[in-house]
Amino acid sequence: MLKNRIIGIFLLLLLLASCRQKEEVICYGTPTNDLMKLLDEEGYQLRIYPSVHEALQKAPKQAGVLLLSKSYPREGVKLDEADQKIIKEKSLRVFMEFPQCVGTTEWVTTDTLELERIVVCDSLNSLLPSMSLLSFQRCIMKQTPNPVANPLLVAAKVAGFNEAVYGLKDTPTQPILYFHNDRLLLSATCMSNFAESRYLPEQRVKALFEYIFNGC
């Protein structure tokens, strides 16, 4: 199931070899980022590097790496072919948000979400069942240049307050969180500034991050 796959990827991503143990987290991003502040407050050891390439070079083998947007919404994060080679050779697990390019593939088209809601495509936990809804208010997203199979979160105009009551059949969707490949998980928008961007409802946003960090 996608649920089990997400648990495994995110736990490795965030270096949570034990859910009861605070670990070192390799990061590219801004220390004032909401996610960075949350991890710091929770006692994680943040290793923040000035470039994507250096973060990947310094990461231990099989480590998790966070590549967070420094320039949202002006510019996305860039991952070149040399970086991809490092990820593969070191078996890294990478979360990257607001992509500008991955290798030779570019994300050039942006869109601002207006009436769309964020829909959970597969049950994550008791607060985030399949078809449950979140609101990423007026977030700016990068439209993927290629089709995405089995996205974890999508943006869509749906009926319902807490859940998409009619599902997603015949409804246009835009991928928000999805796997680019087995080593790289992409967010089409800046998820890490969840507080500043007022992602709602808070309880579900909190449940999403608790699931990511403590899902084992």
PLM features per residue range, with description:
Residues 1-3:
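N-terminal secretory signal peptides that target proteins for export/translocation
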Residues 6-15:
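Sec-dependent N-terminal signal peptides
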Residues 16-24:
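Bacterial Sec-dependent signal peptides at the C-terminal "C-region" and cleavage site
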Residues 23-106:
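Helical hinge/lid and interdomain linker segments adjacent to catalytic or ligand-binding clefts
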Residues 72-150:
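A glycine-rich, often tryptophan-bearing local segment used as a flexible ligand/cofactor-contacting loop or short
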Residues 106-108, 196-200:
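A short, polar/proline- and glycine-enriched secondary-structure boundary/capping micro-motif
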Residues 114-198:
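Catalytic beta-strand/loop cores that center a nucleophilic Ser/Cys/Thr
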Residues 204-216:
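An acidic-aromatic substrate-binding cleft motif
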